[in-house]
A protein has these predicted regions:
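Long, contiguous binding/interaction regions
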Residues: 1-61, 67-90
Length: 90
């Protein structure tokens, strides 16, 4: 899998957010407990998870809210999540 370029997101986060800030991460993944567990392990237990299954039940959208200290922390989390096979970062 080719590494995703997060430069545009980095610019947006640097210009439009005041850090620290609560950031809302969004992902889409197959409805697979293993993938969800891997994604869940990237975040501390204080992070707030919301899941919504697709109509057919094959996929789940995952929203995570967490207090982040910097744009670089957000980018780092997205890079780690994008390395999980099947996870789409939004």
């Amino acid at each position: 899998m080719e590494p995703r370029n997060f430069d545009t997101l980095r610019d947006h986060l640097t210009k439009d957010f005041i850090w620290p800030s609560v950031y809302m991460f969004k992902f889409i993944a197959p409805a697979d407990n293993r993938i969800f567990a891997l994604l869940h392990d990237l975040f501390p237990h204080q992070a707030e998870f919301t899941n919504r299954h697709s109509a057919g039940g094959k996929y789940v959208s995952i929203t995570v809210k967490e207090m982040m200290l910097s744009a670089e922390e957000v980018i780092d989390r997205y890079e780690k999540a994008s390395a999980i096979e099947g996870v789409i970062v939004l």
